[in-house]
């Protein structure tokens, strides 16, 4: 198949005018538009002028007025050629080669010390960086446009950064802000004092071991996930007749707790003999539990994939080595012995306190009766899958967190994927991470092949009807391995992701399937059924000590001696 591409051959500035010259391959540029588009697809800025000469183009962007008469806002922008299909402009390797040839000896030494290929390219692209300083000299008010290869999408972008000094507020406003900050701090300290007072008082009156169980989460609104399976197993073993079981949940760590729960939580934490948590839970790290209390971490994810907790000490977002986070746990339950050192490291606890009973919420994956039932239910809800090969596309998000989370859908050639589906009697279900802000837009002509199931219920239910999983860095691969079916890992930004996020084991030798770093390679793997599926069963055996659907039972018996 002949591939159509857009290449950037030259970048230069004339005052506030950015010029981008380039050429196309196997693509007619007439009647097309050149735009700058941000990664979350919420901003599109049309070029002020475009000159086309055959397959050559010159785009002019006036950054001072590009946003409807205002300056180009702070963001990262792709250069996109808009036609019936969109084409993302790539950097011509000659641009990089020319920049390298012009390096000075001291620059070349600095260049050679860089670890990643994109890091080296971005070092060379500094040549094309443009700064506008207020008055020509300001260090505080600066508008910067930096050409670079984005670590989020592994594509050429223009990174626009606007730096301004903190605005000096008038005296009364400044005083108001200072007072508000003071009272917020006092309010926080008061709440902490009350919380600890209730906890310590309750703890004092419950020094002897009793029969109270608490399930609590700051990121779960109801009894679900591992909690649900543990709770149901306790009911099955009639432990609800022996223990008083309580719950305190809230949907998100940033949500405010209800007035009653503000008092219930410290009271129950001080009283409970068994406290279940399944994620980061800040308040429990601020108090000291009595020795007879069990604080049990049943982490929401299976296995040890991306680093968390103390495994990220010294990195952005990681706790410092003296932090009390996580250290309260008296037990953590995991899926296999392989996970023990990683979870002990992450939580800052002793390895002997990490117990490989299996992960409760995976029990359903081994339930044949449930499998039969859910397959029928899924076919009723998604009739498009009947008699089809079902491919689940379930990547993680890109961006630094909840506020910037997105997925670069332009990394998918939907036309080509649709042709594959037509030829192979297949459908693709897209399950995006809940954080992803930009929605998947499926063209009408593709709706017979693609379905967005991002808002669908439990993702594990979708696994029962999936024939092939395409993912990248999602821990969903552990659950899917149970089905002993193939996976492909579309990791187009692998080098940068490894550098910034870290894994417990080398990604290339760890994942149970074929790794591809371009869409062409992904389609080749699909066309040739080249999945490296032989990796799945060894992966399953390594990470699931038990494959019998009885993890909940083992955990409950281990903890309660039932």
Curated annotation (Swiss-Prot):
Broad EC category: transferase
EC number: 2.7.8.14
Gene Ontology molecular function: CDP-glycerol glycerophosphotransferase activity; CDP-ribitol ribitolphosphotransferase activity
UniProt keyword list: Cell membrane, Cell wall biogenesis/degradation, Membrane, Teichoic acid biosynthesis, Transferase
Topology within the bilayer: Peripheral membrane protein
Xref: Gene3D superfamilies: 3.40.50.11820, 3.40.50.12580
Name of the coding gene: tarL
Family the entry assigns: Belongs to the CDP-glycerol glycerophosphotransferase family.
Protein role: Responsible for the polymerization of the main chain of the major teichoic acid by sequential transfer of ribitol phosphate units from CDP-ribitol to the second glycerol phosphate attached to the disaccharide linkage unit. Synthesizes polymers of more than 40 ribitol phosphate units in length.
Protein name: Teichoic acid ribitol-phosphate polymerase TarL
Catalyses which reaction(s): 4-O-[di(2R)-glycerylphospho]-N-acetyl-beta-D-mannosaminyl-(1->4)-N-acetyl-alpha-D-glucosaminyl di-trans,octa-cis-undecaprenyl diphosphate + n CDP-L-ribitol = 4-O-[(D-ribitylphospho)(n)-di{(2R)-glycerylphospho}]-N-acetyl-beta-D-mannosaminyl-(1->4)-N-acetyl-alpha-D-glucosaminyl di-trans,octa-cis-undecaprenyl diphosphate + n CMP + n H(+)
Pathway assigned in UniProt: Cell wall biogenesis; poly(ribitol phosphate) teichoic acid biosynthesis
Signal peptide positions (record): none
């Amino acid at each position: 198949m002949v591939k159509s591409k857009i290449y950037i051959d030259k970048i230069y500035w004339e005052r506030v005018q950015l010029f981008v010259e380039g050429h196309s391959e196997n693509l007619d540029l007439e009647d097309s538009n050149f735009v700058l588009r941000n990664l979350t697809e919420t901003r599109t800025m049309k070029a002020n002028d475009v000159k086309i000469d055959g397959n050559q183009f010159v785009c002019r962007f006036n950054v001072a007025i590009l946003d409807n008469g205002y300056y180009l806002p702070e963001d990262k922008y792709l250069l996109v050629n808009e036609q019936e299909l969109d084409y993302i402009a790539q950097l011509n390797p000659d641009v990089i080669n020319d920049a390298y040839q012009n390096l000075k000896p001291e620059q070349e030494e600095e260049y050679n010390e860089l670890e990643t290929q994109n890091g080296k390219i971005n070092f060379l692209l500094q040549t094309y960086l443009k700064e506008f300083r207020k008055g020509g000299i300001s260090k505080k008010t600066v508008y910067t446009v930096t050409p670079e290869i984005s670590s989020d999408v592994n594509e050429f972008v223009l990174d626009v950064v606007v730096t301004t000094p903190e605005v000096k507020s008038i005296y009364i406003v400044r005083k108001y802000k200072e007072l508000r900050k003071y009272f917020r701090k006092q309010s926080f300290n008061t709440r902490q004092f009350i919380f600890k007072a209730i906890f310590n008082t309750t703890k004092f009156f419950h020094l002897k071991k009793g029969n109270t169980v608490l399930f609590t989460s700051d990121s779960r609104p109801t009894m679900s996930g591992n909690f649900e399976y543990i709770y149901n197993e306790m009911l099955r073993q009639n432990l609800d007749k022996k223990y008083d079981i309580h719950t305190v949940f809230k949907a998100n760590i940033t949500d405010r707790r209800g007035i009653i729960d503000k008092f219930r939580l410290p009271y129950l934490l001080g009283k409970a003999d068994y406290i279940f948590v399944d994620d980061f839970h800040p308040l429990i790290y601020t108090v000291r539990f009595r020795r007879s209390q069990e604080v049990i971490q049943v982490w929401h994810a299976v296995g040890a994939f991306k680093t968390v907790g103390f495994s990220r000490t010294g990195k952005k977002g990681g706790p410092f080595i003296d932090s009390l986070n996580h250290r309260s746990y008296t037990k953590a339950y995991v899926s296999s012995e392989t996970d023990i050192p990683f979870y002990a490291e992450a939580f800052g606890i002793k390895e002997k306190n990490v117990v490989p009973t299996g992960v409760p919420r995976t029990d359903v994956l081994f339930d044949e009766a449930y499998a039969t039932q859910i397959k029928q239910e899924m076919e009723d809800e998604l009739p498009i899958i009947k008699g089809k090969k079902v491919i689940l596309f379930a990547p993680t998000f890109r961006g630094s967190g909840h506020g910037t989370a997105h997925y670069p859908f332009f990394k998918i050639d939907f036309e080509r994927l649709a042709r594959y589906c037509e030829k192979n009697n297949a459908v693709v279900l897209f399950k995006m991470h809940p954080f992803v802000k930009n929605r998947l837009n499926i063209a009408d002509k593709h709706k017979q092949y693609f379905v967005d199931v991002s808002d669908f219920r439990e993702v594990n239910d979708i696994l029962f009807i999936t024939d092939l999983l395409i993912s990248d860095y999602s821990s969903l691969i552990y659950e899917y391995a149970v089905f002993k079916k193939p996976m492909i890992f579309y990791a187009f930004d692998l080098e940068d992701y490894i550098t910034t996020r870290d894994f417990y084991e080398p990604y290339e030798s760890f994942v149970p399937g074929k790794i591809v770093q371009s869409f062409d390679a992904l389609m080749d793997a699909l066309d040739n059924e080249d999945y490296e599926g032989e990796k799945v069963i060894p992966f399953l055996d390594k990470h699931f000590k038990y494959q019998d659907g009885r993890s909940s039972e083992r955990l409950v018996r281990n903890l309660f001696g039932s």
